[in-house]
């Protein structure tokens, strides 16, 4: 039983349902936009879709490595019915991620462009009336290096839950996060794009039937980390009212660059053929490079891959969020400790096997194809994983023993090794963020997603349940857009969409006919979401204690002025 989305031909629009017979046109602050109506089977009210609306001026030429500028107005009716290009990125990795994550029946091949600051809107509102529906703004994942708004079709979520869904793009990789650590290129350009998109939503969403006073930001992976950063950022004040981080928070250390960012900037400049005399020289030279030249530089840098040679402490798997004194005034750890953040209702969740298959096997090519691992190889591989987990060499034996020591089975050891990395990258940071948010007195909810979507790649082992990204199919209603979902999967997606939309409406996911989801308070109740959805307590409690303790040892051994890594 799959439900087909089909475009309502203007002429055959059924007057009985009051379907508009001409396509939707909406007036924005910058000019008029033309969209299209699409109906989802089973829903009388069509969804108006607007694709590729510019929310900022194209960040080209002298605007490269600068904060986004407001879009230029236009005087004609802008056609917003085709997908915008995705921000420039490694096309292979971008295409792969899109194919693995899309909830569409067919993945859309997207062009690349540095001119990419666009958003898509899905609104179920009757645009002839004054509606004020809750707004859900989606920030895609992809390690801040790849990804696109159009991978995610907001149609099913908008239709089922009567919410306005907005999917946004932001500069990625060198374009989005190049930082010299000083005023010449502060960095965080991609996050500033996210802020600009939220400003645009405040100014315009009412014309699309959305309520600017009820905006929920939600995102997965680097999108979840972005949401978490916006919760910590003074620049995002009053731009959103609730937040959801799926599988990624600002304490996910691989995405946040602490310490000196200059060496990475110099490495990029050298790879691009620029002199590194001063920051100003590097930035000036990189601004002269064509988009193609910077893409070539990106590919040469071999981001998003595990470097098995060389010193892992010097390996750079991605460019990330930096402490720029504007977006982030201090490190996420310091802001968390000071409780210096927006105390909006916050939902934070992880999947049961975050490092189960997609990240290690598809994105980073871990040498695990044999499907087993002995203790010695595990220790060496954990050291090579330093860029992801920041575990000091002297702590590796203890960490490996703790996770892998209980078994001699090398297949089990491999699974436990993947659990270890998942805990350090996602599980432990997510719980710490949720605890800090709760302790600041803000409503907090946690979940662990444990389900294997039928849409998973055939290459993924059947034993991997709750891999990174698996919840996306439920959140975006994939069973209503793709073929082949079971009744169980359809029910799960309906439930998840209802939880997410209730949270967007009320700051509380609970509602009639749904399993009870306890608030994350001192008892640390959370929801396990899957074939059997039920409340449980103390998610990753023991793991948080172990890692907090282990990282504290390292901090004590080394005086604070030397760089140490903390979760």
Curated annotation (Swiss-Prot):
Q: How is it modified after translation?
A: Contains sialic acid. Cleavage of the signal sequence can occur at 2 positions, either between Trp-17 and Gly-18 or between Gly-18 and His-19.
Q: What top-tier enzyme class does this entry carry? A: hydrolase
Q: What does this protein do?
A: Involved in the detoxification of xenobiotics and in the activation of ester and amide prodrugs. Hydrolyzes aromatic and aliphatic esters, but has no catalytic activity toward amides or a fatty acyl-CoA ester. Hydrolyzes the methyl ester group of cocaine to form benzoylecgonine. Catalyzes the transesterification of cocaine to form cocaethylene. Displays fatty acid ethyl ester synthase activity, catalyzing the ethyl esterification of oleic acid to ethyloleate. Converts monoacylglycerides to free fatty acids and glycerol. Hydrolyzes of 2-arachidonoylglycerol and prostaglandins.
Catalysed reactions, semicolon-separated? a carboxylic ester + H2O = an alcohol + a carboxylate + H(+); 4-methylumbelliferyl acetate + H2O = 4-methylumbelliferone + acetate + H(+); a cholesterol ester + H2O = cholesterol + a fatty acid + H(+); cholesteryl (9Z-octadecenoate) + H2O = cholesterol + (9Z)-octadecenoate + H(+)
Q: Which GO terms describe its cellular component?
A: cytoplasm; cytosol; endoplasmic reticulum; endoplasmic reticulum lumen; lipid droplet
Disulphide bonds annotated for this chain are: 87-116, 274-285
Q: Where is the active site?
A: 221, 354, 468
- Sugar attachment sites are 79
Provenance organism: Homo sapiens
Annotated tissue distribution = Expressed predominantly in liver with lower levels in heart and lung. Expressed in macrophages.
Stated name of the protein: Liver carboxylesterase 1
Signal peptide positions on this chain: 1-17
Where is this protein found?
Endoplasmic reticulum lumen; Cytoplasm; Lipid droplet
């Amino acid at each position: 039983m799959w439900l087909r989305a089909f475009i309502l031909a203007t002429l055959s629009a059924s007057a009985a349902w009051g379907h508009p017979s001409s396509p939707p046109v909406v007036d924005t602050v910058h000019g008029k936009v033309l969209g299209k109506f699409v109906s989802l089977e089973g829903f009388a009210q069509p969804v108006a879709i607007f694709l590729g609306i510019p929310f900022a001026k194209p960040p080209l030429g002298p605007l490269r490595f600068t904060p986004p500028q407001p879009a230029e107005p236009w005087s004609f009716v802008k056609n917003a019915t085709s997908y915008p290009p995705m921000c420039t990125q490694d096309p292979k990795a971008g295409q792969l991620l899109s194919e693995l994550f899309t909830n569409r029946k067919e993945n859309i091949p997207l062009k690349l462009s540095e001119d990419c600051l666009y958003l898509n809107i899905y609104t179920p509102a009757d645009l002839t009336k004054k509606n004020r529906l809750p707004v859900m703004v989606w920030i895609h994942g992809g390690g801040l290096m790849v990804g696109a708004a159009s991978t995610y079709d907001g149609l099913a979520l908008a239709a089922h839950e009567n919410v306005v869904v907005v999917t946004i793009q932001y500069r990625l990789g060198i374009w989005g996060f190049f930082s010299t650590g000083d005023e010449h290129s502060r960095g965080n350009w991609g996050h500033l794009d996210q802020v600009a998109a939220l400003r645009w939503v405040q100014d315009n969403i009412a014309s699309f039937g959305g309520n600017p006073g009820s905006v929920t930001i939600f995102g997965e992976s680097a999108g979840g980390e972005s949401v978490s950063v916006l919760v910590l950022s003074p620049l995002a004040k009053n731009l959103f009212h609730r937040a959801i981080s799926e599988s990624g928070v600002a304490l996910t250390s691989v995405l946040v660059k602490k310490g000196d960012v200059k060496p990475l900037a110099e490495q990029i400049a050298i790879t691009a053929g620029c002199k590194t005399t001063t920051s100003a020289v590097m930035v000036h030279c990189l601004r002269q490079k064509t988009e193609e030249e910077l893409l070539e530089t990106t590919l040469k840098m071999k981001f998003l891959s595990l470097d098995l040679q060389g010193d892992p402490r010097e390996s750079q798997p991605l460019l990330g969020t930096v402490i720029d004194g504007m977006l982030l005034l201090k490190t996420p750890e310091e802001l968390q400790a000071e409780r210096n953040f927006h105390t909006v209702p916050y939902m934070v969740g992880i999947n049961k096997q975050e490092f189960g298959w997609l990240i290690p096997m598809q994105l980073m090519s871990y040498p695990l194809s044999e499907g087993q691992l002995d203790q010695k190889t595990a220790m060496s591989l954990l050291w090579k994983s330093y860029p992801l987990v920041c575990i000091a060499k002297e702590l590796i034996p203890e960490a490996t023993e703790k996770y892998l020591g209980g078994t001699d089975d090398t297949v089990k050891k491999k699974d436990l090794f993947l659990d270890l990395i998942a805990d350090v990258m996602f599980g432990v940071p997510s719980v710490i963020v949720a605890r800090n948010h709760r302790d600041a007195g803000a409503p907090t909810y946690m979940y662990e997603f444990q389900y294997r979507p039928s849409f998973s790649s055939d290459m993924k082992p059947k034993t991997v349940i709750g891999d990174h990204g698996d919840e996306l199919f439920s959140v975006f209603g994939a069973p209503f857009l793709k073929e082949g979902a079971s009744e169980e999967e359809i029910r799960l997606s309906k439930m998840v969409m209802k939880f997410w939309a209730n949270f967007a409406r009320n700051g509380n996911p609970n509602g009639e006919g749904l399993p009870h989801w306890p608030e994350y308070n001192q008892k640390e109740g959370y929801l396990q979401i899957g074939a059997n959805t039920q409340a449980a307590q103390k998610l990753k409690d023991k793991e948080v204690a172990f890692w907090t303790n282990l990282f504290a040892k390292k901090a004590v051994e080394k005086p604070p002025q030397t760089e140490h890594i903390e979760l």
